[in-house]
């Protein structure tokens, strides 16, 4: 039966990349560079991601039109900014922070495992992430996708 399989499609967030540790690390670096007091940046990452499903539900239910994940992440960042001392930053700084999702680090075995699978199969993503987000993440993390199926597909 596996001889009939031609392609393997993967979820990305949490499966291939470590979003929690990546977001926490980059948020900590961002905060330090903007003189923001130390906070629990792991909790920040979790709080930010916890708003993902409610935001997606608004899109699925028609409360919001199709909205790219970059935009949903930015809207959700605004919701938690005050709690983490970020609300007085310029919009451009928050836009910069929002791009951490484009630079998530892979799990230690992800690239090697995907590369091995790629030798036998077409490998790709299936994600709610917009294609630009997924391409940037792949380039940054060295993820060897053959195809990226993102939200616009």
Features from the language model and the residues they span:
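Substrate-recognition element of Asp-dependent hydrolases with the DxDx(T/V) motif
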Residues: 91-104, 110-139, 148-151
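Short, glycine/charged-enriched secondary-structure capping and boundary segments
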Residues: 22-25, 138-142
């Amino acid at each position: 039966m596996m001889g009939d399989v031609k392609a393997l499609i993967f979820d990305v967030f949490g499966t291939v990349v470590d979003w929690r540790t990546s977001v926490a690390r980059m948020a900590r670096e961002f905060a330090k560079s903007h003189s923001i007091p130390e906070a629990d940046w792991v909790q920040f990452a979790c709080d930010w991601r916890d708003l993902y499903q409610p935001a997606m539900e608004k899109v699925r239910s028609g409360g919001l039109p199709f909205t790219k994940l970059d935009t949903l992440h930015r809207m959700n960042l605004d919701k938690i900014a005050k709690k983490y001392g970020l609300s007085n930053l310029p919009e451009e700084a928050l836009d910069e922070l929002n791009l951490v999702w484009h630079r998530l680090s892979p799990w230690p075995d992800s690239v090697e495992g995907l590369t091995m699978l790629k030798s036998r199969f077409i490998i790709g993503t299936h994600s709610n992430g917009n294609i630009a987000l997924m391409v940037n993440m792949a380039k940054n993390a060295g993820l060897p996708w053959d195809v990226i199926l993102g939200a616009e597909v």
